UniProtKB/Swiss-Prot annotation:
Highest taxon above the source species: Bacteria
Family indicated by similarity: Belongs to the UPF0210 family.
InterPro entries: UPF0210 (IPR007841)
PANTHER family linked: UPF0210 PROTEIN MJ1665 (PTHR37560:SF1), UPF0210 PROTEIN SPR0218 (PTHR37560)
Assembly and binders: Homodimer.
Name of the protein in question: UPF0210 protein SEQ_0468
Listed HAMAP family: UPF0210
């Protein structure tokens, strides 16, 4: 490595807010299934605290060794609905508390997997888990929940969509930040290192390490050097920058997996912002020539960014996965917040942007009087985009306060302006229930 590359790396870390957002250990809990819920909870606690005992220490050692911040260490587990279904319990609070206690004792930032996969219907454990979510998130510190309500192969479970509209409202009432730790997915992935939607898929190995990187500031700085150049140059610049970022992510993942004695899973090629100035995806889009995010051209700029990040990342690492694209969470991105406050960015434009990027309506505050049917309809719209376009989409919305308020969540979750919601009703549409069938192009066998 020549001195120029060394200098570039130092600048990425010190000036451009580059970091490894998360090292996430995925742990299978299938061998913790028990007909007695207390025994199952004890097994879950034991397995997590054994497998991930050294996760935080190893992460800190690697960060010190490489001089690269590793912001979060996290754990994801098998969807708890699968574990709880073997019991006769009427709620899964004790399992959520076992997850939380394990997370607190090993020192990780979050634990994901209080989850259910209901894209084609409910099993016993799914319904119980979903009804447990509001209190599970209110009575724990570090547990994150997710529910997959649709897939390209299965269509959209509209009964579950209606239920989740209500559950999000109940969760927001039960605790201050509970709804910020709850994601509703279509086409959820099994190897996602990012919260709040991470869970460990049943097709995964017993224990794996997945890595998520963060580098919007690095990309913006690179684009500053090619102002006025053509889109070809723009795409190539993003691609080369994503290559560098992903290479570091792969190195960290391999080091962590070797030291922890578990398999290396994937690097998630997502550009994840933080509330810090200089670490914003919105500012990357504006650097491409937009006056402010939300104006015409925003969706095209995001499409270029997303695609170039994937192309560069795939070249850098032979194991990519997770969500892999640009994240556009409103509360976690100072540029997005400014665009909302400036009147340029609204829910409808964000929905259009989600047809391009890797998540969906993410970390968005809406008025607390928003009806649960309207929230369910937002979920249905996002799920439809994902199901038809064969991609992951998600909704993480927080019904709190009234339009124009600022809601502070703290830490990486940031601050969100409460956004206007279309006042017209979707209640009769949501009340139908049942299943929206899978699209014709899903029928490939």
């Amino acid at each position: 490595m020549d001195i120029r590359q060394v200098r570039e790396t130092v600048e990425m870390i010190e000036e451009q807010h580059f970091d490894i957002r998360t090292i996430t250990m995925g742990i299978s809990l299938l061998d913790c299934i028990d007909s007695d819920i207390d025994r199952a909870a004890a097994k879950i606690y034991q397995k997590i605290t054994t497998k991930a005992a050294n996760l935080v220490a190893v992460g800190d050692d690697i960060a010190a060794e490489l001089g690269i911040p590793i912001v979060n260490k996290r754990v994801s587990v098998t969807p708890i609905a699968l574990i709880g279904a073997a019991t006769d319990a009427e709620d899964y609070l004790s399992l959520a508390k076992a997850l939380d206690q394990a997370a607190c004792d090993i020192g990780v930032d979050f634990i994901g997997g209080f989850s259910a996969l209901v894209q084609k219907g409910y099993q016993k454990g799914d319904k119980i888990l979903i009804e447990s979510i509001p209190q599970a998130l209110a009575q724990t510190q570090k547990v994150c929940a997710s529910v997959n309500v649709g897939s390209t192969r299965s269509g959209i479970n509209m009964t579950a969509v209606a239920d989740m509209g209500r559950i999000i409202k109940e969760t927001a009432k039960a605790s201050e930040i509970g709804a910020a730790k709850l994601v509703v997915f279509a086409n959820a992935v099994e190897d996602n290192p990012f919260m709040a939607g991470a869970f460990h898929g049943v097709g995964e190995a017993d224990t794996v390490i997945n890595v998520g990187v963060s580098g919007p500031g690095v990309v913006k700085r690179a684009l500053e050097k090619v102002r006025g150049e053509s889109f070809d140059v723009l795409a190539e610049t993003v691609k080369k920058t994503a290559f560098k970022i992903t290479r570091i992510g792969q190195l960290v993942g391999q080091m962590a997996s070797e030291r922890l004695g578990v398999g290396f899973g994937v690097v998630d090629l997502s550009l994840a912002p933080t509330p810090a100035v200089g670490d914003s995806v919105a500012r990357v889009l504006e650097e491409m020539g937009l006056e402010i995010v939300g104006t015409h051209g925003t969706t095209a700029a995001l499409a270029l960014l997303n695609d170039a990040v994937k192309k560069g990342g795939v070249m850098a690492c032979n194991r990519v996965g997770g969500l892999s694209g640009a994240f556009i969470p409103v509360s976690e991105d100072e540029g997005m917040i400014a665009a909302v406050q400036g009147g340029s960015l609204n829910l409808e434009k964000l929905e259009a942007m989600t047809a391009i990027c890797s998540v969906g309506l993410d970390m968005i505050a809406i008025p607390e009087e928003t009806p649960s049917e309207t929230i369910a309809a937002m979920i249905a719209d996002e799920a439809a985009i994902g199901v038809i376009n064969q991609k992951t989409t998600a909704v993480r919305i927080i019904p709190k306060g009234k339009e124009g308020d600022m809601i502070a969540f703290g830490g990486l979750l940031g601050t969100a302006p409460v956004m206007a919601v279309n006042p017209h009703s979707s209640a009769d549409f949501i009340a139908r229930g049942g299943q929206i069938p899978a699209p014709i192009h899903s029928f490939k066998n």
